[in-house]
């Protein structure tokens, strides 16, 4: 003990946390493991860190949405408040756009309809990265 904080799952079957393809039983939900990850993240970030991460996610998503609409190729599908995820309609070939994003080093949204993409922005994305993604449009 060096006075360092540690997190463990006590009395957990190891098989619960291996890949589903390799498991020999159906106990693969990983709920306990995900709960541990959330606990670790929240405790490491602290109250102020969580608030900052949420603010960065919100600001980044709204900035990306505004920039995409400003290209003239996107319209917002749901005209409602959002946190860090939003859906836009693209006036071009969505599959070709996604290929450009991948070639540029981005996972550029989830295709939710033939002409629609859902984007999510987290605190890890910078303004420069968002601008680079928009340039690929």
Q: Which role fits each region the language model picked out?
A:
Residues 1-72, 76-79:
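Active-site C-terminal subdomain of aminotransferase-like
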Residues 48-132:
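Conserved C-terminal alpha-helix-loop-beta "cap" of PLP-dependent enzymes
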Residues 136-137:
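C-terminal alpha-helix
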């Amino acid at each position: 003990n060096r006075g360092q904080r540690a997190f463990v799952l006590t009395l957990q079957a190891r098989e619960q946390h291996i890949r589903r393809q390799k498991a020999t039983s159906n106990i693969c939900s990983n709920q306990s493991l995900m709960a541990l990850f959330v606990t670790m993240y929240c405790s490491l970030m602290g109250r102020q860190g969580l608030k900052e991460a949420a603010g960065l996610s919100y600001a980044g998503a709204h900035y990306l949405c505004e920039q995409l609409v400003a290209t003239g190729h996107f319209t917002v599908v749901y005209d409602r408040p959002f946190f860090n995820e939003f859906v836009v309609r693209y006036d071009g070939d969505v599959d070709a756009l996604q290929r450009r994003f991948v070639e540029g080093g981005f996972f550029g949204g989830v295709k939710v309809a033939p002409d629609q993409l859902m984007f999510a922005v987290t605190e890890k994305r910078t303004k420069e990265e968002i601008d680079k993604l928009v340039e690929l449009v």
